[in-house]
Amino acid sequence: MSVNGAVWGRVRSRFRAFPEHLAACGAEASAYGKCVQASTAPGGRLSKDLCVREFEALRSCFAAAAKKTMMGGS
């Protein structure tokens, strides 16, 4: 396999794992989504870093889920 093919193989495997990782972080994804939704509702004002706490919680959870998968855990 070419070097370029190996890179795309890793990218595809990460994309295939994305739904699993997201499912493992349902509460965090929901909290972030609710924050963004409330900020974009009529009268709401979405701005940078408005939902940063929720985003960081989701990012941390997602990274932990990805690491767990890479280590062979389920």
Curated annotation (Swiss-Prot):
GO BP terms in the entry: mitochondrial respiratory chain complex I assembly
UniProtKB keywords: Disulfide bond, Mitochondrion
Motif mapping: Cx9C motif 1: 25-35
InterPro entries: NDUFAF8
Cellular component, GO annotation: mitochondrial matrix; mitochondrion
Residue span(s) of domain CHCH: 22-69
Bridged cysteine pairs (disulfide): C25-C61, C35-C51
Short sequence motif named Cx9C motif 2, residue ranges: 51-61
Compartment annotation: Mitochondrion
Main location: mitochondrion
Description of how the protein assembles with itself and partners: Interacts with NDUFAF5.
Function: Involved in the assembly of mitochondrial NADH:ubiquinone oxidoreductase complex (complex I, MT-ND1). Required to stabilize NDUFAF5.
Name of the protein in its database record: NADH dehydrogenase [ubiquinone] 1 alpha subcomplex assembly factor 8
Originating species: Mus musculus
